[in-house]
């Protein structure tokens, strides 16, 4: 059984690796790790010409020993990456899905 500390490390590693994939040098990928309250985010900040770019790409929380994915703007899906690292599906909640729809997935309901 994985520990919360392992979950923290997995999340931080995945967000750090994802931050290296910025496609434009005018865009900053910022990782935000609140390890006391278990909130983790990857945010893009910058400008493309006169257009402001700002957005949360990934937002994960650890709540009651489960990983809650609040936002996932990736194609591969961070839930799949967590499973590949050995995190059981019953410890991952797709928080961006409505609660009444979560039982249709292989992941935790909440």
Indicate residue ranges for each PLM-predicted region.
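Terminal domain-initiation and capping elements
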Residues: 1-110
């Amino acid at each position: 059984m994985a520990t919360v500390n392992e979950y923290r490390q997995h999340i931080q590693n995945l967000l750090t690796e994802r931050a290296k994939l910025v496609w434009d040098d005018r865009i900053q990928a910022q990782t935000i790790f609140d390890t006391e309250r278990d909130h983790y985010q990857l945010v893009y900040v910058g400008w493309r010409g006169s257009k402001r770019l700002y957005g949360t790409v990934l937002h994960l929380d650890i709540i009651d020993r489960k990983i809650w994915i609040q936002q996932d703007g990736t194609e591969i899906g961070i839930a799949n990456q967590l499973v590949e690292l050995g995190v059981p599906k019953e410890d991952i909640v797709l928080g961006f899905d409505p609660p009444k729809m979560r039982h249709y997935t292989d992941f935790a309901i909440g």
